[in-house]
């Protein structure tokens, strides 16, 4: 990592609280912006498709969750490339960086091929899981097209690892904003049929998703192939040649990261399945509340990525004073933002929900009323979700991935999902019970991960003395 990036992420000297605040924002804002823009793409699709009715919106919720679960597990291996490339970059070793990136792309291609049968059988899987056959059919048609966008999306994630490692994360924000604008304009045209083009409905949104993901990959390839600081890596020279050490390193680092991310994401996907079993209205309302919560989550997620860099650099320097101060500041920023978001969700839930469904539709009143009650619970959910996300980032900065993955699995599934099902069905709370299970599961994760981080820092401080 270049000295300029280190200077931005870990303040020199005494490391005042203000310098930590400033450094966190300098690193975190572009990452947060990129996350928000990425989520905005799916949010735009929901807003547009929601105008077609509750059934189409419910199908869009399932399709988005289905695609995201498959994507996010594969992206964990792409995330693993970042520290490998960063270390090679710091050593001036372009060859090792190129090999890591190449093997990261190999893994992405292999993963996409392995995932194709899941997409081909999406409708059958959803019907088996108790979803409404009509909703499952709409979802299956969408995913039959969207599967072609998975590969460029994964490859883009690998190459953004190089861009981040050399301190050029701003380009990720720029390309994601372009993707957001392209997606909104093209989806509006193809879904409803404007400028002489036929109305394609949900399938139009799927076509646009493929185009936008392909554009992002082509854009970042052009960037790394033409910029002086990146074209020296010669990423596609002898692309066919394997490097088994780099390949196994990507797999070794990526698996626990993928498991950690997937454990939380699949909790939400499973909750959508539970909601679908309760009813179409509840599933549509759940999708609205979940999308709002997901938008808010992009802020602690961006801060989590910043936390990994800042704590990792401080630990490498053996500077525990700045490590602790950086951690406290990131916690403070995350909690402050979550509290503001929670107040907003509690104050105007119906206003927020109306963005996702045309109030004039016959079923809109029932969906919006139910969604408003879930949005209030989502306000509480924000705080604990933000804490556990930031703490996971701090632990990655200490290169601690295996134990957090285990803690996440325990918190999300045996605790969170089990309680969600129990409160929804045996206890009779319905969809609200699912969300209460969310809150308890993520609260457990927040506590366990925070305890793990505190104990680990104390142990490493003791060892360093």
Swiss-Prot record:
Multidrug efflux pump. GO terms for biological process: monoatomic ion transport. Belongs to the multi antimicrobial extrusion (MATE) (TC 2.A.66.1) family. The gene is norM. PANTHER family: FMN_FAD EXPORTER YEEO-RELATED (PTHR43298:SF2), MULTIDRUG RESISTANCE PROTEIN NORM-RELATED (PTHR43298). It is found in: Cell inner membrane. One of its GO terms (cellular component) is plasma membrane. NCBIfam families: matE (TIGR00797). The chain crosses the membrane at residues 61-83, 104-126, 141-163, 170-192, 202-224, 251-273, 283-305, 326-348, 368-390, 403-425, 435-457. It is a multi-pass membrane protein. GO terms for molecular function: antiporter activity; xenobiotic transmembrane transporter activity. Pfam families: MatE. This is Probable multidrug resistance protein NorM. InterPro entries: MATE_fam (IPR002528), MATE_MdtK (IPR050222), MdtK-like (IPR048279). Keywords: Antiport, Cell inner membrane, Cell membrane, Ion transport, Membrane, Transmembrane, Transmembrane helix, Transport.
């Amino acid at each position: 990592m270049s000295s300029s990036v280190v200077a931005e992420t870990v303040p020199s000297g005494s490391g005042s609280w203000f310098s930590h605040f400033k450094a966190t924002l300098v690193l975190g804002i572009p990452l947060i912006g990129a996350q928000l823009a990425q989520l905005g793409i799916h949010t735009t699709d929901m807003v547009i498709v929601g105008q077609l009715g509750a059934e189409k919106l419910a199908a869009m919720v399932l399709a988005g969750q289905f695609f995201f679960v498959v994507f996010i597990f594969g992206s964990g291996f792409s995330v693993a490339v970042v520290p490998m490339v960063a270390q090679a970059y710091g050593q001036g070793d372009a060859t090792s960086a190129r090999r890591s990136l190449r093997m990261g792309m190999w893994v992405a291609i292999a993963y996409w091929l392995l995932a194709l049968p899941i997409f081909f059988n999406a409708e059958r899987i959803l019907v088996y899981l108790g979803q409404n056959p009509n909703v499952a059919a709409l979802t299956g048609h969408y995913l039959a097209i969207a599967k072609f966008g998975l590969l460029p999306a994964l490859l883009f994630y690998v190459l953004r690892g190089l861009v981040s490692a050399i301190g050029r994360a701003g380009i990720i924000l720029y390309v994601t904003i372009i993707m957001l604008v392209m997606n909104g304009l093209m989806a509006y045209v193809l879904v409803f049929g404007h400028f002489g083009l036929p109305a394609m409905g949900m399938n139009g949104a799927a076509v646009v998703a493929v185009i936008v993901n392909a554009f992002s990959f082509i854009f970042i390839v052009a960037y790394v192939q033409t910029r002086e600081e990146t074209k020296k890596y010669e990423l596609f020279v002898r692309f066919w040649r394997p490097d088994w050490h780099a390949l196994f390193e990507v797999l070794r680092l990526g698996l626990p990261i993928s498991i950690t991310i997937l454990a939380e994401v699949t909790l939400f996907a499973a909750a959508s399945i539970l909601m679908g079993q309760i009813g179409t209205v509840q599933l549509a309302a759940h999708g609205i509340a979940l999308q709002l919560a997901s938008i808010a989550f992009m802020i602690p997620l961006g801060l989590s990525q910043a936390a990994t860099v800042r704590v990792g650099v401080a630990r490498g320097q053996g500077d525990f004073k700045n490590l602790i101060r950086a951690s406290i500041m990131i916690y403070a920023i995350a909690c402050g933002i979550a509290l503001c978001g929670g107040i907003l969700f509690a104050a105007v839930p119906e206003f927020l929900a109306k963005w996702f469904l045309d109030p004039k539709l016959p079923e809109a009143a029932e969906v919006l009323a139910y969604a408003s009650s879930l949005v209030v619970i989502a306000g509480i959910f924000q705080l604990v979700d933000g804490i556990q996300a930031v703490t996971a980032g701090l632990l990655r900065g200490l290169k601690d991935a295996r134990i957090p993955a285990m803690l996440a699995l325990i918190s999300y599934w045996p605790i969170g999902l089990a309680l969600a099902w129990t409160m929804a069905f045996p206890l009779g709370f319905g969809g609200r019970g699912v969300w209460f299970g969310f809150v308890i599961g993520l609260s457990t994760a927040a506590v366990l991960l925070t305890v793990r981080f505190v104990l680990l820092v104390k142990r490493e401080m003791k060892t360093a003395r």
